[in-house]
Amino acid sequence: MVQLALKEEKELTKEEIKELQKEVRRLAKEKNAVILAHYYQRPEVQDIADFVGDSLELARKASQTDADIIVFCGVRFMCETAKIVNPEKKVLHPNPESGCPMADMITAKQVRELREKHPDAEFVAYINTTADVKAEVDICVTSANAPKIIKKLEAKKIVFLPDQALGNWVAKQVPEKEFIIWKGFCPPHFEFTYKELEKLKEMYPDAKVAVHPECHPRVIELADFVGSTSQILKYATSVDAKRVIVVTEVGLKYTLEKINPNKEYIFPQSMNYCGTVYCCTMKGITLPKVYETLKNEINEVTLPKDIIERARRPIERMLELS
């Protein structure tokens, strides 16, 4: 049954899912492997993880683990980050094709060119960047800690990359600094429109609205709360409201309902296909792929030593200031 699932990547029955999950956990114990998963992963993948979290939480866990193998259920830049903070560990990525479109919207060469134009600026990279780009910047941030960290920086000028939505949101909270913001974006978050959210608010006038800062500025204007995935999780499950409209990737719904099933979490219907607020690359990691990767110890993440050394500094600086 397991072999059939691996060959065809067919939709698994509940029994097949349970069987495969047990086998993954057995292998993890046998190989001293830790499985890390982002909130946007499929429910059956989240269920086999030792830890589920957002980018900041996962970076911390990756840096603290004593496991021999890290199986990272997330997109490519997350796996690279795990390798950077744990270069001696074997980091495995269940689907090497699962990249992040936003991370690919800026290159190391473009960062170097920006350095020449803005030599007096502090270069701040969203964690959603490639290892090559991290190696060129001064510090990394996540959506959970960006305002806090940037307020602590001595530089008056900030070059923020690559996410324009997060950059604009942070700039409003840190008005004392000058921002030069790259024009990258997260397609699923940024393509969700003001009009779509207005319609949802009209349909559910009693609902609170929680929005991820990767969303368009006009969408953010309609929010009762703006925060990272983990911050939205805390807000939505504890706010004094029976309904919460949640504008982030639909994978979070699974965790929300597990923590507080007494609330109604409303996600736009357009999330049902690879489009608005549905991350196809996150969903590209399947339970059979996790099983095959761990069983055969394939899809290992490798990076040049000099990139690891240079990219580690901005990540460690972020963790120190968080």
UniProtKB/Swiss-Prot annotation:
Q: Give the record's cofactor note, including how many are bound.
A: Binds 1 [4Fe-4S] cluster per subunit.
Q: Which InterPro entries match?
A: NadA, NadA_sf, Quinolinate_synth_type2
Keyword Cytoplasm among record annotations: yes
Please provide, in alphabetical order, the Gene Ontology terms of the cellular component aspect for this entry. cytosol
Give compartment(s).
Cytoplasm
Give the protein's cofactors: [4Fe-4S] cluster
Primary localization: cytoplasm
SUPFAM superfamilies in the record: NadA-like
Pathway membership, UniProt:
Cofactor biosynthesis; NAD(+) biosynthesis; quinolinate from iminoaspartate: step 1/1
Protein name per Swiss-Prot or TrEMBL: Quinolinate synthase
